Amino acid sequence: MFRTHTCGELRISDVNKQVKLSGWVQRSRKMGGMTFVDLRDRYGITQLVFNEEIDAELCERANKLGREFVIQIVGTVNERFSKNSHIPTGDIEIIVSELNILNSAITPPFTIEDNTDGGDDIRMKYRYLDLRRSAVRSNLELRHKMTIEVRSYLDKLGFLEVETPVLIGSTPEGARDFVVPSRMNPGQFYALPQSPQTLKQLLMVSGFDRYFQIAKCFRDEDLRADRQPEFTQIDCEMSFVEQEDVITTFEGMAKHLFKVIRNIELTGPFPRMPWSEAMRLYGSDKPDIRFGMQFVELMDILKGHGFSVFDNATYIGGICAEGAAGYTRKQLDALTEFVKKPQIGAKGMVYARIEADGTVKSSVDKFYIQEVLQQLKEAFGAKPGDLILILSGDDAMKTRKQLCELRLEMGNQLGLRDKNTFACLWVVDFPLFEWSEEEGRLMAMHHPFTSPKPEDIHLLDTNPAAVRANAYDMVINGVEVGGGSIRIHDSQLQNKMFELLGFTPERAQEQFGFLMNAFKFGAPPHGGLAYGLDRWVSLFAGLDSIRDCIAFPKNNSGRDVMLDAPAALDPSQLEELNLIVDIKE
């Protein structure tokens, strides 16, 4: 037996017990004739004491222990003289009588501490060391607890967990697929699933009326803080349901997770916001409603006064930051540079301060008399001490998105985005289609299987861009944690959808014939939702990136620097797969 207890288990009630512990050396220090060693395992840290007056040879061996040595000790639990209130085992220590070195270790490239000195790249390269840190390990423990709660919750509601294939056919709609060559079928490829979408719909046709899966998904897309090339979905589907049924079920799951994971009781239904309102007031389909600063359109007030930037704009909008009139010129210049960054793309920013006497002082005073500036103040309901920030542009949607970035930045600067405050909502009534300039055609805003609102079906022939989707996203603190829709279950309507998306009947049959044929055998009305497990864990753990809630993530370039993947294949493997690599310049 390597241990009788873990390193986080022993308490003052265990004094005088003889115990056996195993773990890693966190640190050691010598004080007079005593050597103190902090022994760490997954469960915590226990202080070990070696006394040269009791056993000089044992103490000498302890002095040679290095960081991350794997050791086993036998000793007696003793009440600690200098207690440590920061750790659960801080009232006790172990007087060691026996030491076994199970494995030595070279000096790690960074300190295995919560406040490590390791940068992101080195931590990713030695991820197995990074995972020894409690700050990272606790995220995976949280993830484990969440998956247990999800399974328990859905099981009680009669959902069945069904695994779907990971090697499937490629579909060009949506993000790019990761593809896998088939050795047995030369020149042909599998794709890794972006989601189990069509497969779970087939399960509904099969009569599995309540399905779920903790599903690994893959998308070959540009990465950012809340994206990884492989990620995990809590994937769910239900038969004989309408939108209200799905929302009720999964809002209930969200409330359950908040209660058991964060001990937060969410009462009342989550607010719902149409997509058009979210874009108009927040410039985003995932608005952070922890704070105000809703957009106000200012075209009627500010256009036509000789300021060419506004006079030539097709959209002028602003936000009001309460109590921020004290911003210095340097701070305002920094905000201007922020919105002018290439990834945001604004050409500049106008500001207006509400002075203590109620007058308005702006950066464009020479174009606007005080009467007009007072109208500006009234449009926001602004008070003395407030700061109004304004953007304009020739594309309303782009300008709103720029204003969204400015709003979030102001929320950060003013401390309005507390990670321990949670604001949940459903965004509903999305457009069914969006126009792609790159493709020169309509694209499905969600996916081709999303049902239109029944009351909008008549518009499919005359004004498809006006058709709303029977779709819904759950947004928490400005993060889309899940989304879904009621699906099309009628083969004629599905064919119409493919036609509007530019599919020929032959192409639709080639790519989705298996689903269309299944519908002919009686498909029930069905719908579902997928939660992003990584995003939920990140949200509850207060992380800025989903990377630290994934055991072995990729970096921002999509590389696994620990495994050095992706990598070139051996020529013999390429030959076996009938592949030739031809890298374009």
UniProtKB/Swiss-Prot annotation:
Residues 197-200 are annotated as: Aspartate. Its EC number is 6.1.1.12. Gene3D superfamilies: Bira Bifunctional Protein, Domain 2 (3.30.930.10), GAD-like domain (3.30.1360.30), Nucleic acid-binding proteins (2.40.50.140). One of its GO terms (biological process) is aspartyl-tRNA aminoacylation. Its main location: cytoplasm. ATP binds at residues 219-221, 228, 480, 532-535. It is an enzyme of class 6 (ligase). SUPFAM superfamilies: Class II aaRS and biotin synthetases, GAD domain-like, Nucleic acid-binding proteins. L-aspartate binds at residues 173, 219, 446, 487. One of its GO terms (cellular component) is cytoplasm. GO terms for molecular function: aspartate-tRNA ligase activity; ATP binding; nucleic acid binding. InterPro entries: Aa-tRNA-synt_II, aa-tRNA-synth_II, aa-tRNA-synth_II/BPL/LPL, Asp-tRNA-ligase_1, Asp-tRNA-ligase_1_N, Asp/Asn-tRNA-synth_IIb, AspRS_core, GAD-like_sf. It catalyses: tRNA(Asp) + L-aspartate + ATP = L-aspartyl-tRNA(Asp) + AMP + diphosphate. Keywords: Aminoacyl-tRNA synthetase, ATP-binding, Cytoplasm, Ligase, Nucleotide-binding, Protein biosynthesis. It is found in: Cytoplasm. Transmembrane segments: none annotated. HAMAP family: Asp_tRNA_synth_type1. Catalyzes the attachment of L-aspartate to tRNA(Asp) in a two-step reaction: L-aspartate is first activated by ATP to form Asp-AMP and then transferred to the acceptor end of tRNA(Asp). Homodimer. Belongs to the class-II aminoacyl-tRNA synthetase family. Type 1 subfamily. This is Aspartate--tRNA ligase. It comes from Bacteroides fragilis (strain YCH46).
